Amino acid sequence: MTDIVDLDRYPLDKLESAEGQALIKDCQKALSRDGMFNLPGLIRPRMLEQMVGEVLPIIKSSSFTHRRRHNVYFLPEIEGLEPEHPALTEFETANHTVCADQIPDSALIKLYLWPPLADFLAAVMQKPALYPMDDPLACLNVMAYRS
């Protein structure tokens, strides 16, 4: 996995180490404060390019496209807002989805199925365990938003 993940910077495979525990605590703090955490450089640049190269042609040629019109709330009305309120203005979005079965041998699937990633995420979210989904389509989706 060292070819995909920068394990020197992010010791996901050594969560019991002092460095692993510090990473977990830092991510928990960011998650609590910001609702998210960011791990810049987690995926090595060369592998990130490879992952994009594996997925992009499929997005362009055979992704599932879903278009719909909606407002920012995805609801026709919001209590307390007049119908002409700007937040209720509708716009169209289109997302293009590639499912896991379309990229079965990709580096992205390899990363998703790597047990230390699930262990790390479980530790950050203070869950006893997380598991990869068995569904061969829904376990991993890559989405692109464009016209």
Region annotations inferred by a language model:
Residues 1-33:
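Fe(II)/2-oxoglutarate
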Residues 28, 48-49:
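Short functional linear motifs
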Residues 34-36, 48:
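A common structural microfeature
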Residues 37-43:
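Short amphipathic
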Residues 43-46, 53-62, 83-136:
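Signature of the catalytic double-stranded beta-helix
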Residues 57-79:
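Short, solvent-exposed beta-strand-terminating loops
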Residues 125, 142-147:
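Conserved short histidine dyad/triad with adjacent acidic residue
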Residues 136-142:
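Long, hydrophobic, well-ordered secondary-structure blocks that form the structural core
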